[in-house]
Amino acid sequence: RSVSRGLGDVYKRQGKAFVSGVAGERFCVRNSGAVAVVEGVGDHGCEYMTGGTVVVLGQTGKNFAAGMTGGIAYVLDENWDFYQRVNKETVSLEPVEHKYDVATLKELIREHVELTGSPRGKEILDDFSEFLPKFKKVLPYDYDHMLRVIASMEERGLDGEQAQIEAFYAVQKNK
């Protein structure tokens, strides 16, 4: 495969990007809200990412998610060695198990196949139950904590925006 996208694609962008092929290094650097699906990335993918969602349907280079403070990445780890290439200082690696995550992942791959005709994406969709356990959810620790506090506020009856505001103050108070 050749590199089809280069340095800094999706840098500070919004919207969606679907790449049938492998991207170069620093794919989705400083992503602050875009959704991207790609079939592999070079070194430093999702570096300094603050928001958005990224799906990687293949290998990553080294130092994935360095400085990532927000957003979520789903990475296919067929060789069970992704942990060696991810920068674990600010993120955790989890299985993709929650129904929201499973639905999001599957829908983004479906959209990727529909828009790009990706054989790789189709292969994964056709055998999704076999591939699902091989995906890792990359989630920043602080972002995960904030999502949990927001959910707690919503359980107390606050609406979305008010729950976010109250969660922010609660987290700041406990620092």
Which residues does each predicted region cover?
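Single conserved hydrophobic/aromatic residue that forms the stacking wall/gate
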Residues: 1-11
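Non-catalytic terminal/interface segments that mediate subunit docking, oligomerization
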Residues: 5, 15, 172-175
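Detector for repetitive beta-architecture
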Residues: 9, 14-16, 33-35, 46, ...
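Alpha-helical scaffold domains
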Residues: 12, 31, 105-108
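Feature marks extracellular polysaccharide-active and adherence modules
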Residues: 20-22, 29-30, 38-39, 47, ...
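Short, glycine-/Ser/Thr-/acidic-enriched flexible segments
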Residues: 22-25, 41-43, 61-62, 79-81, ...
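Intrinsically disordered, low-complexity terminal regions
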Residues: 57-58, 65, 69-175
